């Protein structure tokens, strides 16, 4: 029997016009949007799914990075997420958003994925404009925007 996340993922794949996408043996489903934004969905429980945006590797040469990340995480928390987290295997910064499965639709999932993508763009630009660059071979500042963002904005 399929989980609620699996059923939603099937409907989401149909909505966006891809053949099929599914969770792997670790209950993760990963994909790229425009070959720039890497997203992972986790079938965390029968109550919710997690949406992760892969931002990039931690810069080890910038002393202000940790403080700026704490500042960003507070800002995201005040605005309902997503939240910054660290994935030790890839030594990468992620944005994580909890997506409740009650009354979930493919449209709602797509909207929340878009919130994560917009938040990734904003985080990347704000950090870049403060001289902090996340190591990410896919997200290039030129591909995102030439915006002069110096402040975070709500992705919703």
From Swiss-Prot:
Q: Which GO terms describe its cellular component?
A: cytoplasm
Protein location:
Cytoplasm
Question: What InterPro entries does the entry give?
Answer: Tir_chaperone
One Pfam family of this chain: CesT
Q: Tell me the keywords, alphabetical order.
A: Chaperone, Cytoplasm, Virulence
GO biological process: what's one of them?
A: protein secretion by the type III secretion system
The protein's job, in short, is: Chaperone for the type III secretion of Tir. Probably stabilizes the protein, prevents inappropriate protein-proteininteractions and aids in secretion.
* Name of the protein in its database record: Tir chaperone
Which classification does the entry list for the species? Bacteria, Pseudomonadati, Pseudomonadota, Gammaproteobacteria, Enterobacterales
């Amino acid at each position: 029997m399929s989980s609620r996340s699996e059923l939603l993922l099937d409907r989401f794949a149909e909505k966006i016009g891809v053949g099929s996408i599914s969770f792997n043996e670790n209950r993760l489903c990963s994909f790229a949007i425009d070959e720039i934004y890497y997203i992972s969905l986790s079938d965390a429980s029968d109550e919710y799914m997690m949406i992760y945006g892969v931002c990039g590797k931690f810069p080890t040469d910038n002393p202000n990075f940790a403080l700026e990340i704490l500042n960003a995480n507070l800002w995201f928390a005040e605005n309902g997420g997503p939240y910054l987290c660290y994935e030790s295997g890839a030594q990468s910064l992620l944005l994580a958003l909890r997506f409740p499965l009650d009354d979930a639709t493919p449209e709602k999932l797509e909207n929340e994925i878009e919130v994560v993508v917009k938040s990734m763009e904003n985080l990347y630009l704000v950090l870049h404009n403060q001289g902090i660059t996340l190591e990410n071979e896919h997200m290039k500042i030129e591909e995102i925007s030439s915006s002069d963002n110096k402040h975070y904005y709500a992705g919703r």
